[in-house]
Amino acid sequence: MDNPLRWFEIPTTDLDRATAFYEAALATALRRESCGGNPMAIFPYTCPHPGGALVAMPQLAPRDNGTLIYLDGGDDLNAVLARIPAAGGSVVMAKTDLGKGIGHIGLFIDSEGNRVGVYSQN
């Protein structure tokens, strides 16, 4: 197994609001689709690399204490974290150096109440 992550889903209660949040916070466009009758907003990715989506499924609920994923924070993690409040979320951990050249992370609560991380090598 070269990479254990293949796909992730971030639950939403309001897909339009969550899509607007992530598009603003990450400065990117998400692609809207439906899979099995469930609406989704898919993050940009290319096969065979891992991908993921925001999903609106009644059996899934946003959480701030469940599984934690880290999205790509690009070259300027501080810029991503600075956009979080205006997009409707809150930063719960500022840019933090992991040491030993591993990179940097930050944590936020999204517009739906999910705790999500961002990672950058810089």
Residue ranges and their predicted role:
Residues D2, E9-P50:
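Core segments of cupin and vicinal oxygen chelate
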Residues N3-T13, R31-S34, I42, Q59-P85, H104-I109, ...:
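Vicinal oxygen chelate
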Residues A18, P50, V80, G88-V91, ...:
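Amphipathic alpha-helical interface surfaces
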Residues A18-Y22, I84, G113:
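Conserved active-site tyrosine of GNAT-family acetyltransferases
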Residues Y45-T46, M57, D72, Q121:
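Generic beta-structure capping elements
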Residues P50-G51, E112:
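Short alpha-helix boundary/capping motifs
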